[in-house]
């Protein structure tokens, strides 16, 4: 990039090498038509490295459940639940014109924020938030200063297996094999603990937007599996934690699913819940989840450490742990047909949104063997609580984690 200064501090962190761009919104509306703030489709143009980038975006459909709610607590411990209108939301998926394999996941809430990928390179874009200016920064992940250089990992263990490779899917088209898979959908609840609430300066609006950005990316990640991700609830433990969130990730993973079963599921139906915490788990672990437990009334859960300010990295971590719930093992570098994918035991320095052939086969096997009913929405009543896939409680070796 043309060097724009010594460094710049953005929401994503301190960036040393970036290019200032000025996205121009293209509005092909009929004369006299009123332009909405967040149209179903939007197009922007800007220049990167002297090349014109045409960003075509479509509003993310089905990002929120019809009964989407947000819950926080009063000083005396009462639950306060609201049902905000989310129809005119600001989250998009898209592509770069004239690049066949391009992808984009963008929030247009306050300027443009997100990432796009062209010719195998991932670029991030973020508003500079300058008064009377549409200036944005475009940069690569390698140019973001890392506060912690340790390798982040998943705490899950698994047994390596041999797989027959299948064609890697694109972001739009499913392979013939995947087209035979049933359309599935995961109703996801996110729970924010007190440490994460404090980390974001008790700004519930900021936390909510941050989590919605991440789920929007998750939605794109799982699309090639014919699996839809729908956000149903964000709950904030803004006054105090309702479990003891320990630095030992395995201990926290035992406590959170129990709370989900005894408290959460009695008032709000969901297929899966993830705890979001700023507690620094022991060692290199940044995520942990039970393996093959999607739809289990207790163990369909995972825990996520808020280890990065970059939405893509956090979305990949969340997708990784959800992948374990869906029966996916860690990728074996020597047996899986993917250089950089979602399910390695260690978080890649070059984040990927692609599942390997191993993960595809694991998911297919999970659907066939476990027959998880809760993610096949058309066959279930909307007011029923998900039932267990198996009558047996998961063993310790069915716990999988992520290290970064």
Curated annotation (Swiss-Prot):
Positions of disulphide bridges: 295-374, 336-358, 338-341
Cellular component GO terms, alphabetical: extracellular region; plasma membrane
Signal peptide range: 1-6
Lineage: Eukaryota, Metazoa, Chordata, Craniata, Vertebrata
Propeptide cleavage-removed residue intervals: 7-177, 379-404
Protein family according to the UniProt entry: Belongs to the venom metalloproteinase (M12B) family. P-I subfamily.
SUPFAM superfamilies to which the protein is assigned, alphabetical: Metalloproteases ('zincins'), catalytic domain (SSF55486)
Enzyme Commission number(s): 3.4.24.-
Its biological purpose: This probable venom zinc protease is not hemorrhagic when 3 ug are injected onto the back skin of guinea pig.
Region Disordered: start-end pairs: 385-404
Protein name in the entry: Snake venom metalloproteinase H5
Cofactors required: Zn(2+)
GO molecular function, one term: metalloendopeptidase activity
Biased composition (Acidic residues): 394-404
InterPro entries: MetalloPept_cat_dom_sf (IPR024079), Peptidase_M12B (IPR001590), Peptidase_M12B_N (IPR002870), Reprolysin_adamalysin (IPR034027)
Complex formation: Monomer.
Domain Peptidase M12B: 184-379
Co-factor: note: Binds 1 zinc ion per subunit.
């Amino acid at each position: 990039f043309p060097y724009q200064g010594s460094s710049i501090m953005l929401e994503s962190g301190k960036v040393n090498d970036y290019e200032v761009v000025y996205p121009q919104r293209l509005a092909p509306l009929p004369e006299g038509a009123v332009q909405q703030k967040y149209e179903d489709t939007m197009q922007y143009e800007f220049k990167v490295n002297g090349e014109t980038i045409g960003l075509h975006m479509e509003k993310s459909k089905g990002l929120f459940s019809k009964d989407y709610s947000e819950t926080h607590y009063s000083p005396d411990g009462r639950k306060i639940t609201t049902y905000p209108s989310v129809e005119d939301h600001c989250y998009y998926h898209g592509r770069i014109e004239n690049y066949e394999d391009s992808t984009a996941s963008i929030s247009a809430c306050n300027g443009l924020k997100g990432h796009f990928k062209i010719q195998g390179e991932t670029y991030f874009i973020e508003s500079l938030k300058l008064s009377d200016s549409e200036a944005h920064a475009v940069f690569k992940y390698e140019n973001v200063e890392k506060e912690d250089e340790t390798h982040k990992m998943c705490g899950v263990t698994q047994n390596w297996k041999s797989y027959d490779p299948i064609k890697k899917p694109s972001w739009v088209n499913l392979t013939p094999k995947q087209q035979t898979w049933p359309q599935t959908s995961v109703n996801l609840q996110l729970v924010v603990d007190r440490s994460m609430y404090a980390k974001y300066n008790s700004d519930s609006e900021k936390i909510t937007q941050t989590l919605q950005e991440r789920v929007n990316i998750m939605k794109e990640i799982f699309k090639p599996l014919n699996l839809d991700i729908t956000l149903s609830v964000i709950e904030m433990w803004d006054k105090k934690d309702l479990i003891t969130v320990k630095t030992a990730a395995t201990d926290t993973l035992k406590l959170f699913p129990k709370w989900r079963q005894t408290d959460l599921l009695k008032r709000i139906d969901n297929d899966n819940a993830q705890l979001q915490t700023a507690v620094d788990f022991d060692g290199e672990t940044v995520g942990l989840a039970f393996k093959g437990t999607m739809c289990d009334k207790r163990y369909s859960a995972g825990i996520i450490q808020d280890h990065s300010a970059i939405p893509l990295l956090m979305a990949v971590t969340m997708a990784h742990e959800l992948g374990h719930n869906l029966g996916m093992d860690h990728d074996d570098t020597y047996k899986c047909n993917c250089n950089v994918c979602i399910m390695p035991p260690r978080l890649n320095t070059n984040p990927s949104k692609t599942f390997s052939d191993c993960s595809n086969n694991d998911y297919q096997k999970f659907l066939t063997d476990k027959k998880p009913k809760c993610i096949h929405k058309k066959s279930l009543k909307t007011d029923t609580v998900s039932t267990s896939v198996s009558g047996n409680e998961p063993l310790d070796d069915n716990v999988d984690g992520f290290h970064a």
